[in-house]
């Protein structure tokens, strides 16, 4: 089974992916972790690396390559803002494609708690990062990140806790056509 989970920072994609991975024994591949690792390898902050990635398409190409390679082996949770799009462009059909969304201030608070940062600083970074990524996705892939038409399920994650979001997805998996 291949499941893609996408969402902007702070929507709960990583938490949800981990819960699903544990429940179904699926490998968890996260584009964000790949991106963060690459930033660390180059001794850059996420903001610096996002700016670098805007003009260096090899960053996205490497992340994409790793995601497609993982998906070709099957049985995984593929987490990333473009995970669903990358598989679609590679003609790999996931069993379930999910997008999590949440109110921007809810996301900002979650990020500030996760990163142990002041809310105002977290908001500034979040806005900058998302603008950078939106521009990059449009230029490199001709993808509008706000286009949710490829997803089977879109969940407003600020309405439920992590277990509530997990339960919704679990029911969807149980009811997938064989």
Curated annotation (Swiss-Prot):
One protein family per Pfam: Cytidylate_kin2
Residues noted as binding ATP in the record, renumbered to the chain: 7-15
Enzyme class: transferase
EC number of the protein: 2.7.4.25
Domain of life, source organism: Archaea
Location relative to the cell: Cytoplasm
Recorded GO CC terms: cytoplasm
GO biological process, one term: pyrimidine nucleotide metabolic process
Reaction(s) the record says it catalyses: CMP + ATP = CDP + ADP; dCMP + ATP = dCDP + ADP
Entry similarity comment: Belongs to the cytidylate kinase family. Type 2 subfamily.
NCBIfam families: cyt_kin_arch (TIGR02173)
Listed name of the protein: Cytidylate kinase
Gene this protein is translated from: cmk
């Amino acid at each position: 089974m291949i499941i893609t989970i996408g969402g902007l920072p702070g929507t709960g994609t990583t938490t949800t992916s981990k819960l699903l991975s544990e429940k179904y024994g699926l490998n968890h591949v996260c584009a964000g972790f790949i991106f963060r690792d690459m930033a660390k390898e180059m001794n850059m902050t996420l903001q610096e690396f996002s700016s670098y990635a805007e003009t260096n398409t090899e960053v996205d190409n490497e992340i994409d390559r790793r995601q497609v390679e993982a998906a070709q082996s099957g049985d995984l949770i593929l987490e990333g803002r473009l995970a669903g799009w990358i598989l679609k462009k590679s003609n790999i059909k996931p069993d379930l494609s999910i997008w999590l969304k949440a109110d921007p201030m809810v996301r900002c608070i979650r990020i500030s708690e996760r990163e142990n940062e002041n809310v105002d600083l977290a908001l500034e970074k979040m806005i900058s990062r998302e603008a950078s990524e939106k521009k990059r996705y449009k230029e490199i892939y001709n993808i509008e990140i706000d286009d949710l038409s490829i997803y089977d399920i879109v969940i407003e994650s600020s309405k439920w806790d992590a277990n509530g979001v997990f339960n919704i997805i679990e029911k969807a998996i149980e009811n997938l056509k064989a």
